[in-house]
Amino acid sequence: MFPRPLTPLAAPNGAEPLGRALRRAPLGRARAGLGGPPLLLPSMLMFAVIVASSGLLLMIERGILAEMKPLPLHPPGREGTAWRGKAPKPGGLSLRAGDADLQVRQDVRNRTLRAVCGQPGMPRDPWDLPVGQRRTLLRHILVSDRYRFLYCYVPKVACSNWKRVMKVLAGVLDSVDVRLKMDHRSDLVFLADLRPEEIRYRLQHYFKFLFVREPLERLLSAYRNKFGEIREYQQRYGAEIVRRYRAGAGPSPAGDDVTFPEFLRYLVDEDPERMNEHWMPVYHLCQPCAVHYDFVGSYERLEADANQVLEWVRAPPHVRFPARQAWYRPASPESLHYHLCSAPRALLQDVLPKYILDFSLFAYPLPNVTKEACQQ
């Protein structure tokens, strides 16, 4: 899926190349790893480069980027990666009727990934990462040795259902329809559980995939679920958020009434590398430059993309991705639009740098929060 990297992009107006700036720029609180020197977060630096070269904030203000259509995330072409020759070859890689245009868009998205990841200083391998970043990555990649695939799970992007599928494939569960409370650790193997040589072998030879979601919609889903339903999160995070950002909150708030703008203010002040996994940027969870994923599925096409992956890895025909429950009400584009339009514009502009690589790498348009759009 990732051909040879393109020639690095020229820095705007004679500026430093991306990788050199990564090595030189200070970060403040964020650190590369245990005892490592400070590093500038790639998302922050990438945002600064984009702003300097193309006036991104002005485009956000005018709603220009919001008019861009998201690029559908679809199967890779036939050009080989290691897994195809050394793991069971999934059948039916040819495009379905009517998918040719979608393949073109997928190719455009791949060029974006190659252009960003091909910059000097960007990681090419998990062992290029600082210790802390590599630890986070390896703890989020699940392993199926029986079906020879690796799945980087992203919270709030159907990861519980994928873990349920993996337990069925491992013979731990009889069916994906078993409605037991999901244990997110037991009977699952993570790359972090393996020795370095075992990790390298699987990264080279196994089919690798992840699923992504519109970044702010994912944040809204985490906000609604964790602060609206789960007492542990209300006590651990909600109470602290209220103390920090609400005037006259008192010393012991319950944390069960955090507003979305308060949550966004909290995210602005957090180091992305140390965030809770439910709102950590996908870039930091799955490191798509360090790991060359064969497929990136999307939440918007969840069931179709997931079942395509199961065909590719030759899962038994009776194992299908669970259908969404009738009672489930996910965060919708309409709900997201309402919450974003209710938040201060300046606050949104402060939040976007944390997630700009998730928008750009995975081809999601930036939100349109102009006055005109919010009045509709």
Curated annotation (Swiss-Prot):
Family that this chain belongs to: Belongs to the sulfotransferase 2 family.
Chief subcellular location: Golgi
Catalytic activity of the protein: dermatan + n 3'-phosphoadenylyl sulfate = dermatan 4'-sulfate + n adenosine 3',5'-bisphosphate + n H(+)
Function according to Swiss-Prot or TrEMBL: Catalyzes the transfer of sulfate to position 4 of the N-acetylgalactosamine (GalNAc) residue of dermatan sulfate. Plays a pivotal role in the formation of 4-0-sulfated IdoA blocks in dermatan sulfate. Transfers sulfate more efficiently to GalNAc residues in -IdoUA-GalNAc-IdoUA- than in -GlcUA-GalNAc-GlcUA-sequences. Has preference for partially desulfated dermatan sulfate.
Lineage, highest ranks first: Eukaryota, Metazoa, Chordata, Craniata, Vertebrata
Identification of the protein by name: Carbohydrate sulfotransferase 14
Glycoprotein recorded as keyword: yes
Transmembrane segments: 40-60
Record key words, sorted: Carbohydrate metabolism, Disease variant, Ehlers-Danlos syndrome, Glycoprotein, Golgi apparatus, Membrane, Signal-anchor, Transferase, Transmembrane, Transmembrane helix
Topological domains annotated Lumenal: 61-376
GO molecular function, one term: dermatan 4-sulfotransferase activity
Tissue distribution: Widely expressed. Expressed at high level in pituitary gland, placenta, uterus and thyroid.
